[in-house]
From Swiss-Prot:
One of its GO terms (molecular function) is ATP-dependent protein folding chaperone. Belongs to the heat shock protein 70 family. This is Chaperone protein DnaK. Gene3D superfamilies: 1.20.1270.10, 3.30.420.40, Actin, Chain A, domain 4, Substrate Binding Domain Of DNAk, Chain A, domain 1. Acts as a chaperone. The lineage of its organism: Bacteria, Pseudomonadati, Pseudomonadota, Alphaproteobacteria, Hyphomicrobiales. Residues 604-638 are annotated as: Disordered. Keywords: ATP-binding, Chaperone, Nucleotide-binding, Phosphoprotein, Stress response. The keyword Zinc-finger does not apply. Induction: By stress conditions e.g. heat shock. Residues 604-618 have a biased composition (Low complexity). The gene is dnaK.
């Protein structure tokens, strides 16, 4: 049976794992790393780079290197959080045809789901290389506080990448699975997950194979990226103060500052002070300018203190919703790279009154949990029951724009709830049902998931028609809606078409685009391999021709030189073709066979001459005297 893989699709880094016997195992990528940067870059010639290769060239190609795209997934272009991000990233965030936030590289627009799909493809290839077989199914993690649109967009990304997404699982829940799989005693745990772009807190009861989420809360726009940006803003301000130059509009400088900020932040988790040194950051009439600055841990902590404090309110809300106090939490599990920051650990300790548990790898634990869930779905992992919750209340807009809740937040999923509604006016033949998700009292203040019209109602006085609306949340946390007119018995299944999101046609087009890109990538790799082989052959043949050319006829020399020239021309062509290079490589190999034969004969002749010389000198060889030493004697003398 083909393996189902577990993927942690992170804001900053992604990770893939698989069940290996009874244990989940993280798979190393082609670069030998256990995590892959969630970055995609497009070079000027259209080549697509994913992961570490994309990160390596980010400084020289800032406008076409896309990162932290997960923060945009499932969001509208007008979203205030998107507006904020627009001014902080070197690449362009544009408005998609559907009104969603898209990104642009080399003048072409991409949906965040498409970029995420490219990262998922890299994860898929990593797993396939390790397993030696095709991978078609996966469990993908999302922040617990993701809404329906964000979950649907993540599922779309999986489809575009050529994966059947068996389950969307919440990141803190996945971490709890990996942490508690071998725990038999009942425990109440808190999973504090501060990653690259999102923050989640989940309270769970675990024990004897049952993982029950009691509550979840969070902030989908709070993470390591915000900490980096806060430090970048500080560096820009300090440089302006010292040099009078504003680096805010210099995209190349901003990318260098971002890399330096991330590095400094990581270093300050284990040391009290670090130095940021960026030579030639910019130049003015007086010459080049350099940025050199000493940064202490205390200064960093003061810069980001409000960001760390923002995690406290969701933690308190989650405790309240779960009906437990901080003292009743047996263990606090830290997840996400930002949880390594001493200030974060200090705040967690103060909040929960105990040292947080640091026994799991915060970068890998989510992927391991996803692999365990994949094992559960595949039947390889037995006696595990996972009960998750919906993070946000679900309801509809009723008279006066009020948000009427049907399913409260932290309801265990999957779940189904029905409620009967009626018309607001006489002889109303259609009703518009607007479905929203959120915690505000007015529908307009919550996230509109979508709307649909129920038409063909028989003319009646207002309040008479009985329309039963059923909301169904599946195990992925994705919403489906159906409506039934009780008067006529007519039932209609309605799939919410999100106010934004990708249509089936969009997804199909992107799937084809991804497939053609995979074919292009394969073709490009074949061309590079063919070029390498050709250039190696050209080099060795030219050397042999120089050393032994006089051993073959002039006609053979000309044929070899012509074949070399033809192969060089093929490898240097702008649109180099692998098949053409291979054919010309074969031709060169064939015409240079006589040269190879001549070299072999010349070397044989040289070998024969050397043997004769050795035989002549044989009379002068002196026999050496020797004495045999037995093992026992050797041991005594040692």
């Amino acid at each position: 049976m083909a393996k189902v893989i577990g993927i942690d699709l992170g804001t900053t880094n992604s990770c893939v794992a698989v069940m290996d016997g009874k244990d989940a195992k993280v798979i190393e990528n082609a670069e030998g790393a256990r995590t892959t940067p969630s970055m995609v870059a497009f070079s000027d010639d259209g080549e697509r780079l994913v992961g570490q290769p994309a990160k390596r060239q980010a400084v020289t190609n800032p406008t076409n290197t896309l990162f932290a795209v997960k923060r945009l997934i499932g969001r509208r272009y007008e979203d205030p959080t998107v507006e904020k991000d627009k001014h902080l990233v070197p690449f362009s965030i544009v408005k998609g045809d559907n009104g969603d936030a898209w990104v642009e590289a080399n003048g072409k627009g991409y949906s965040p789901a498409q970029i995420s799909a490219m990262i998922l493809q890299k994860m898929k290839e990593t797993a396939e290389s390790y397993l030696g077989e095709k991978v078609e199914k996966a469990v993908i993690t999302v922040p617990a506080y993701f809404n329906d649109a964000q979950r649907q967009a993540t599922k779309d990304a999986g489809k575009i990448a050529g994966l059947e997404v068996l389950r969307i699982i919440n990141e803190p829940t996945a971490a709890a699975l990996a942490y508690g799989l071998d725990k038999k005693d009942g425990k109440t745990i808190a999973v504090y997950d501060l990653g690259g772009g999102t923050f989640d807190i989940s309270i769970l009861e675990i024990g004897d194979g049952v993982f029950e989420v009691k509550s979840t809360n969070g902030d989908t726009f709070l993470g390591g990226e915000d900490f980096d940006m806060r430090l970048v803003e500080y560096l820009v301000a300090e440089f302006k103060k010292d040099n009078g130059i504003d680096l805010k509009n210099d995209k190349l400088a901003l990318q260098r500052l971002k890399e330096a900020a991330e590095k400094a932040k990581i270093e300050l988790s284990s040391s009290q002070q670090t130095e940021i040194n960026l030579p030639f950051i910019t130049a003015d009439a007086s010459g080049p300018k350099h940025l050199t600055l000493k940064l202490t841990r205390a200064k960093l902590e003061s810069l980001v203190d409000d960001l760390v404090q923002r995690t406290i309110a969701p933690c308190k809300a989650a405790l309240k919703d779960a009906g437990v106090t901080a003292a009743e939490i047996d263990e606090v599990v830290l997840v996400g790279g930002m949880s390594r920051m001493p200030k974060v650990q200090e705040v967690v300790k103060q909040l929960f009154g105990k040292e947080p548990h640091k026994g799991v790898n915060p970068d890998e634990v989510v992927a391991l949990g996803a692999a365990i869930q994949a094992g559960v779905l595949q039947g390889d992992v037995k006696d595990v029951l996972l009960l998750d919750v919906t993070p946000l209340s679900l309801g509809i807009e009723t008279l006066g724009g009020v948000f009427t809740r049907l399913i409260e937040r932290n309801t265990t999923i999957p779940t189904k709830k029905s409620q009967t509604f009626s018309t607001a006016e006489d002889n109303q033949q259609a009703v518009t049902i607007r479905v929203s998700q959120g915690e505000r009292e007015m529908a307009a203040d919550n996230k509109l998931l979508g709307q649909f019209d129920l038409v063909g109602l028989p003319p009646s006085p207002r309040g008479v028609p009985q329309i039963e609306v059923t909301f169904d949340i599946d195990a992925n946390g994705i919403v489906q809606v159906s409506a039934k007119d009780k008067g006529t018995g007519k039932e209609q299944q309605i799939r919410i078409q999100a106010s934004g999101g990708l249509s089936d046609a969009d997804i199909e087009k992107m799937v084809k685009d991804a497939e053609s890109h995979a074919a292009e990538d394969k073709k490009r790799r074949e061309t590079v391999e063919a070029k390498n082989q050709a250039e190696s052959l050209i080099h060795s043949t030219e050397k042999s021709l120089k050393d032994y050319g006089d051993k073959v006829s002039e006609a053979d020399r000309t044929a070899i030189s012509d074949a070399i020239a033809a192969l060089k021309s093929s490898t240097e062509a702008t649109e180099a073709d692998a098949e053409d290079i291979k054919a010309k490589t074969q031709t060169l190999m064939e015409v240079s066979m006589k040269l190879g034969q001549a070299i072999y004969e010349a070397q044989q002749a040289e070998g024969g001459a050397a043997a004769d010389a050795s035989a002549e000198g044989g009379d002068n060889v002196v026999d050496a005297d020797y004495e045999e030493i037995k093992d026992d004697d050797r041991k005594k003398s040692a």
